[in-house]
C-alpha cells in the first residue's frame, strides 16, 4: 500500500497543445505526510541465509489506506463514466522502469494516429522527457509530474484530461509511473489495464508481482527482438503468466521490429468495435 512506501509530494501537470489555464495542479496526501510508518517485523530466529521477514501494516495504516482507496475508487468511476460518454478507449499501461512503455506507445502512435487519434497522459516522478518524445511522434501528450508519489491516481488523471480535447480523439493511453507495486491498487477509470514486462526482466517476473499481473486484461511481453540474446525462455514465461493471470490476453511484441503488433492492434480494434462506435466526422455523418 502506498501510504507505507513514503509517497507524499505535489503533483503537477505540464502540457502542450490545447492550452487551457496554467497546466499545474497541486496534489497532496495529508494522511501520507502526517502518519508515522509502523511495521511489525517477523521472526529472526533462523540463520541469516534462511530468514524470511514478513512486514504487516498496523490497523491504523490499514484504515488510512482503505479511506484513500475508497475516495480514489469513487473518482475512478466518475472518470470511467465520463470517458465512456465520450466513446473513448482508455488504456492504463503499467510496468517496471525500462520495460519499454514509452517506446511501445511511440510506435503505436506512429502506426495508428491517422485512423485512431490518440492522446497520452504520462506519469513520471520528474522530467517531461517521455511526453516530449511522444509529442515528437505525433501524440498529444500531457505530463503529470508526481514528485515522490510513485503512482498516478484518478484525481490526477481527471485534471490532466481537462487539458485535452477529448472530442477529437478516440483513444487515451495513460502511461503510469514505472512501478509494479503501488499503481496496481489505483483504478484510474480505464477500460483496459495493460501490463508490460520485457524479456530482460526474467521469466519469473509474474510470480514476483502476482497482484499486478492478476489485475491485467492484457499483458505485453516486450523487447522480443532481443529475446534470443538474453536466452529468454518463452515457454516458461508463458507457463508463469498462465499460472498467475489466466484471464489476460498475452501478446509477444517488439516496438523496434514490429513483431506481434498487428495482433495487438487487431485486438484493440475489435475491443473498441464491440464497446464503442468508431469516431465519425460529423460532417460525414
UniProtKB/Swiss-Prot annotation:
Q: Which residues does the record give as Zn(2+) binding sites?
A: 150-151, 182
| Positions of transmembrane segments | none
Q: Which InterPro entries match?
A: CobW/HypB/UreG_nucleotide-bd, Hyd_mat_HypB, P-loop_NTPase
- Name the phenotypic consequences of knocking out this gene: Disruption of the gene abolishes hydrogenase activity but does not affect urease activity. The hydrogenase activity of the mutant can be increased by the addition of nickel.
Q: Which residues bind Ni(2+) 1?
A: 2, 5, 7
Q: Where does the record place the region Disordered?
A: 16-54
Keyword vocabulary terms for this entry: GTP-binding, Hydrolase, Metal-binding, Nickel, Nucleotide-binding, Zinc
> What domain of life does the UniProt record list for this protein's source?
Bacteria
Q: Which GO terms describe its biological process?
A: protein maturation
Bias kind Basic and acidic residues: ranges: 27-36
| Spans annotated as G-domain | 90-251
Residues at which Ni(2+) 2 binds? 150-151, 182
* Polar residues: compositionally biased ranges: 44-54
Described purpose of this protein according to its UniProt entry: Involved in the maturation of [NiFe] hydrogenases. Required for nickel insertion into the metal center of the hydrogenase. Exhibits a low intrinsic GTPase activity, which is essential for nickel insertion.
Q: Which family does it belong to?
A: Belongs to the SIMIBI class G3E GTPase family. HypB/HupM subfamily.
Q: Which protein are we looking at?
A: Hydrogenase maturation factor HypB
> What organism is listed for this UniProt entry?
Synechocystis sp. (strain ATCC 27184 / PCC 6803 / Kazusa)
Amino acid at each position: 500500500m502506498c501510504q507505507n512506501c513514503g509517497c507524499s509530494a505535489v503533483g503537477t501537470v505540464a502540457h502542450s497543445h490545447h492550452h487551457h489555464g496554467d497546466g499545474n495542479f497541486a496534489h497532496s496526501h495529508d494522511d501520507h505526510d502526517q502518519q508515522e510508518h509502523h511495521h511489525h517485523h517477523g521472526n529472526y530466529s533462523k540463520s541469516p541465509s534462511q530468514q524470511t521477514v514478513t512486514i504487516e501494516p498496523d490497523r491504523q495504516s490499514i484504515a488510512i489506506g482503505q479511506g484513500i482507496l475508497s475516495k480514489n475508487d469513487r473518482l475512478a468511476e466518475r472518470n470511467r463514466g465520463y470517458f465512456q460518454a465520450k466513446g473513448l478507449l482508455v488504456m492504463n499501461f503499467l510496468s517496471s522502469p525500462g520495460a519499454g512503455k514509452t517506446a511501445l506507445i511511440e510506435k503505436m502512435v506512429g502506426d495508428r494516429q491517422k485512423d485512431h487519434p490518440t492522446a497520452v497522459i504520462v506519469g513520471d516522478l520528474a522530467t517531461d522527457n517521455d511526453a516530449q518524445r511522444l509529442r515528437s511522434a505525433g501524440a498529444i501528450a500531457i505530463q503529470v509530474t508526481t514528485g515522490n508519489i510513485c503512482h498516478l491516481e484518478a484525481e490526477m488523471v481527471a485534471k490532466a484530461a481537462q487539458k485535452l480535447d477529448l472530442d477529437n480523439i478516440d483513444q487515451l493511453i495513460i502511461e503510469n509511473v514505472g512501478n509494479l507495486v503501488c499503481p496496481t491498487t489505483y483504478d484510474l477509470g480505464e477500460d483496459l489495464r495493460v501490463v508490460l514486462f520485457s524479456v530482460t526482466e526474467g521469466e519469473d517476473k509474474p510470480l514476483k508481482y502476482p497482484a499486478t499481473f492478476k489485475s491485467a486484461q492484457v499483458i505485453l511481453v516486450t523487447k522480443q527482438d532481443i529475446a534470443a540474446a538474453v536466452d529468454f525462455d518463452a515457454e516458461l514465461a508463458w507457463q508463469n503468466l498462465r499460472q498467475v493471470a489466466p484471464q489476460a490476453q498475452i501478446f509477444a511484441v517488439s516496438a523496434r521490429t514490429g513483431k506481434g503488433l498487428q495482433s495487438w492492434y487487431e485486438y484493440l480494434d475489435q475491443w473498441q468495435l464491440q464497446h464503442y462506435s468508431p469516431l465519425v466526422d460529423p460532417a460525414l455523418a
